[in-house]
UniProtKB/Swiss-Prot annotation:
CDD domains: LysRS_core, LysRS_N. Binds 3 Mg(2+) ions per subunit. Mg(2+) 2 binds at E417. It comes from Pseudomonas entomophila (strain L48). It is an enzyme of class 6 (ligase). The lineage of its organism: Bacteria, Pseudomonadati, Pseudomonadota, Gammaproteobacteria, Pseudomonadales. This is Lysine--tRNA ligase. It is found in: Cytoplasm. InterPro entries: Aa-tRNA-synt_II, aa-tRNA-synth_II, aa-tRNA-synth_II/BPL/LPL, Lys-tRNA-ligase_II, Lys-tRNA-ligase_II_N, Lys-tRNA-synth_II_C, NA-bd_OB-fold, NA-bd_OB_tRNA. Its cofactor is Mg(2+). Its EC number is 6.1.1.6.
Length: 500
């Protein structure tokens, strides 16, 4: 038997013994009466007190005798002093033998790390300068039956952190910070758009036709209607129906589902912002996106320089704007324009680069394959990549000067796609033709090609004003702003295989 396996068994036996002891303590609490009281109401948060009274001296606090009521989980227990943690941070509480009853003092000795307590008393400062609550009353509110990870081993196993996020949040301040930032980012995006007259809406999660993106959907069955349905891959077609209906500026922040691979950049369930504005084009969205990203960086980091791993992304500088075609030539100087304009040569280059070439792709699709294999990972600083071929942009408006490409961009930062946007196709007849072309692609073996959506075509036939739309991946954006290496680090409960 390996040493590691033996150590794991020993740790498990030790944990089981601690759990048994804690259950005995809970049983004793039950005998006393209500083991889980719910009549305590706090009036202060730990970190708020730390901030509010940071400049008060020991003498000033003693003279003021400021009464407080706090509650939290015991994270450290040093006998006379305990450290409790609430949603804002930590504070010390002092077990004063002069002000607490003998029964209370005896009970305190039985409490464990992880227990949740209430503490009432006055604020004071220690000789070392630490703020604490000198308790006049303290109670056990919730008995913790499982021990917290100890200081030596901690919760360092990445997979366990994802599976037991509740423990991860208890013991890792970095994790708590990440998800506070995530909430802050979403709140600011919402504020940013509402201030610009966008209306927040909700569109169906269950759809009869999965549309709005090139992706493989999750399929389910509606029992009452006896019909197949799909978890949405994108809200796009419903949001554009709302623009047709007269809601000229709309947005939605919600979940999308794509039945595809899992990686450090992909989770099958993810959060997306999509917004649409009438009487605007994709260039307007580029300007809006730059402004939003600068505000978010300043809000979260206090700077427009965004550190990520060993790199720093500069949000304060104008984002690079480069077409798909030109970016291939810029980052692959051994290739020529003639190479990219010949379908046979482009197919050869795409295959050599590692793309999955089926053999029926047109020139535009092959160019995008080459871009994805040879350019995408090289786009470190923010890049708006524009003029995607119409073959891979079935919902985007063709460019007036070059109908072979569309008025579309994707935003890349750190070699990752963060946003996708375009001037929307509002020609109903052109849209119908492109849907038919997508159906042909699906029949030829492309399981990410789109379905034909007759109702959406009908909506366009009523007339949609010139419109620009965009989708921004919230998870990848939060990864950047929190310097997180994996998408699982910014999703509270990422998808995992069940434990054996």
């Amino acid at each position: 038997m390996s040493d590691l396996k033996t150590e794991a068994q020993d740790l498990q036996q030790e944990e089981n013994a601690l759990i048994a002891l804690r259950k005995e303590k809970l049983a004793a609490e039950r005998v006393k009466g209500n083991a889980f009281p719910n009549d305590f109401r706090r009036d202060s948060y730990c970190n708020d007190l730390q901030k509010q009274y940071a400049d008060k001296t020991k003498e000033e606090l003693e003279a003021a005798a400021i009464p407080v009521k706090v509650a939290g989980r015991i994270m450290l227990n040093r006998g006379s002093f305990m450290v409790i943690q609430d949603m804002t941070g930590r504070i010390q509480v002092y077990v004063n033998r002069k002000t607490l009853s003998e029964d209370t003092l005896a009970a305190v000795k039985t409490w464990d790390l992880g227990d949740i307590i209430s503490a009432e008393g006055t604020l004071a400062r220690s000789g070392k300068g630490d703020l604490y609550v000198e308790m006049t009353n303290v109670r056990l509110l919730t008995k913790s039956l499982r021990p917290l990870p100890d200081k030596h081993h901690g919760l360092t196993d990445t997979e366990q952190r994802y599976r037991q996020r509740y423990v991860d949040l208890m013991v890792n301040e970095e994790t708590r910070h990440t998800f506070r930032v995530r909430s802050q980012v979403i709140s600011h995006i919402r504020k940013f758009l509402i201030e610009r007259d966008f209306l927040e809406v909700e569109t169906p999660m269950l759809q009869t036709i999965p549309g709005g993106a090139a992706a493989k959907p999750f399929e389910t069955h509606h029992n009452a209607l006896d019909m197949a349905m799909f978890l949405r891959i994108a809200p796009e077609l419903y949001l554009k129906r709302l623009v047709v209906g007269g809601f000229e500026k709309v947005f939605e922040i919600n979940r999308n589902f794509r039945n595809e691979g899992v990686s450090t950049r992909h989770n099958p369930e993810f959060t997306m912002l999509e917004f649409y504005q009438a009487y605007a084009d994709y260039r307007d969205n580029m300007d809006l996106t730059e402004e939003l990203f600068r505000e978010l960086a300043q809000l979260v980091l206090g700077s427009t320089d965004v550190p990520y791993g060993d790199k720093v992304f500069h949000f304060g500088e104008p984002f690079v704007r480069l077409s798909v075609f030109d970016s291939i030539l810029k980052y692959n100087p051994e290739l020529t324009a003639a190479d990219l304009q010949d379908v046979d040569r482009a197919r050869e280059i795409a295959k050599k680069a590692g793309a999955k070439v089926l053999g029926h792709e047109g020139l535009g699709k092959l160019q995008v394959m080459i871009f994805e294999e040879l350019v995408e990972h090289k786009l470190e600083q923010p890049h708006f990549i524009t003029e995607y071929p119409f073959e891979v942009s079935p919902l985007a408006r063709r460019n007036d000067d070059n109908p072979a490409v569309t008025d579309r961009f994707e935003l890349f930062i750190g070699g990752r796609e963060i946003a996708n946007a375009y001037s929307e196709l509002n020609d109903a007849e052109d849209q119908a033709e492109r849907f038919l072309a997508q159906v042909a692609e699906k029949d030829a073996g492309d399981d990410e090609a789109m379905h034909y959506d007759a109702d959406f075509v009908r909506a366009l036939e009523y007339g949609m004003p010139p419109t620009a739309g965009e989708g921004i991946g919230i998870d990848r954006l939060v990864m950047l702003l929190t310097n997180s290496p994996s998408i699982r680090d910014v999703i509270l409960f990422p998808h995992m295989r069940p434990q054996a």
